[in-house]
A protein has these predicted regions:
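Vicinal oxygen chelate
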Residues: 1-7, 11-19, 44-47, 60-122
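N-terminal beta-strand motif that seeds the catalytic metal site of vicinal oxygen chelate
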Residues: 1-26, 35, 50-52, 67-69, ...
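Short beta-strand-to-loop elements that line the ligand-binding cleft
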Residues: 14-16, 37-39, 93-96
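Conserved active-site alpha-helix within GNAT-family acetyltransferase domains
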Residues: 22-30, 104, 113
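Conserved acetyl-CoA-binding loop of GNAT-fold acetyltransferases
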Residues: 30-37, 87-89
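Conserved short beta-strand elements that form part of the metal-binding/catalytic scaffold
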Residues: 35-67, 113-118
Length: 122
């Protein structure tokens, strides 16, 4: 096990800096079945499936910094509907792609863009 990173963590971890840590964490739990609790004074570790995202408060030294992330889910259509119900803006409605993904795209209230996909095969 490498000693340069925590056990079970990948080498690359996306980080979102937001001005509403609690709101964004709630959105991720409601829409993407994310797990993780907001921690004060430290980045919040959010787990989505087998992946980790760090989210932290903006302000002070860091300005809010949104992300563009591609996320595989069990049902892209249902996840898209949940995102819209949670206040996200539709960028692309669910559609099949030539590379086997059923994919949609939304922008959340905090300006993060989420491509939501389910692989269906070629």
């Amino acid at each position: 096990m490498p000693k340069f990173k925590p056990a079970g963590w990948p080498s690359v971890i996306p980080r979102i800096v937001t001005r509403d840590l609690t709101g964004l964490a709630g959105f991720l739990r409601d829409v993407l079945d994310a797990e993780g609790d907001v921690r004060s004074g430290a980045p919040t570790e959010i787990r989505i499936g087998d992946s980790i995202i760090l989210i932290s408060d903006g302000g002070g030294v860091r300005d809010a910094m949104p992300a563009f992330l591609y996320v595989y889910v069990e049902n892209a259509d249902e996840t898209y509907r949940r995102a819209i119900a949670a206040g996200a803006e539709s960028i692309e409605a669910p559609a099949d792609t030539p590379y086997g993904d059923r994919r949609a795209m939304v922008r959340d209230t905090w300006a993060n863009v989420w491509q939501i996909a389910t692989y269906r095969g070629n």
